[in-house]
Amino acid sequence: MVRNNSTSIVDRYQSELLQPQKEIVKRLRAFIARRYPELTESLKWHVPIYSLNGKNLLGLQDFTAHVNLNFFRGAQLHDPRRILIGKGKYVRHVTFRSVADIDCSALKGFIDQAIQPI
């Protein structure tokens, strides 16, 4: 993952979260950084956003009791197990209430699709 000043800002964002959101965000960020080094991490709209070639692909959003991983083109992703949540025109998300909810193999499939050209 491209490491820059934005990543330091995201580190600060993460440090201010409460548990379990802090640990969920930490694990998701580590997975994305390790598996998708080509993505750029930044803080936009007060949440971590991942982009490729200037196009926003993913976002982490914390809530009181969970964290969502948003896929900005989620409606276009192949999801036969119906893991993705949402009914809007474009965005879909996966909700994590604990680190035990993180299924890296399913996420890999969605992120692999998301980074493909439209």
Predicted features by range, described:
Residues 1-118:
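Charge-dense, helix-prone N-terminal extensions
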